[in-house]
Amino acid sequence: MKIEFNSEFTQEGQEKNINFVSPVEISEYEGATVYEFSEPSKEHLSRIEINSNSNEVLIITDSMTMILKLNEEVENAIALGQGKFFLKSLLNKLEHNDSESFFAYVLKDTSGNELACFKITLKIFE
């Protein structure tokens, strides 16, 4: 199986896009659909867990773990080098089926200032 990953995001007033196709491993874990894949240019493993029942998304990369909950702000600790900083996440939209998933979220600093908006689409194909 393959995944087409597309991330449209706005950060500091600039719109950016990341798009790639990669082999994907799909599994189930505690009611969530799990996608494990590598971004070709960085060769690091990413894991995205989507749980439609609890309306949660978990994003795990080599440098961070981000928890997203639908219509609920969540404080996330992000590790950088020896230190940590905190961001708030808010999942605004979640759509999920076997062949395509879409979710949109906002990242804020701890004072509530918006830092970035993301729209993520995952398409699964043979």
From Swiss-Prot:
In terms of InterPro entries, this protein maps to: Calycin
User: Origin, by domain of life?
Assistant: Bacteria
Tell me what this protein is called. Answer: Uncharacterized protein MYPU_6810
The species is: Mycoplasmopsis pulmonis (strain UAB CTIP) (Mycoplasma pulmonis)
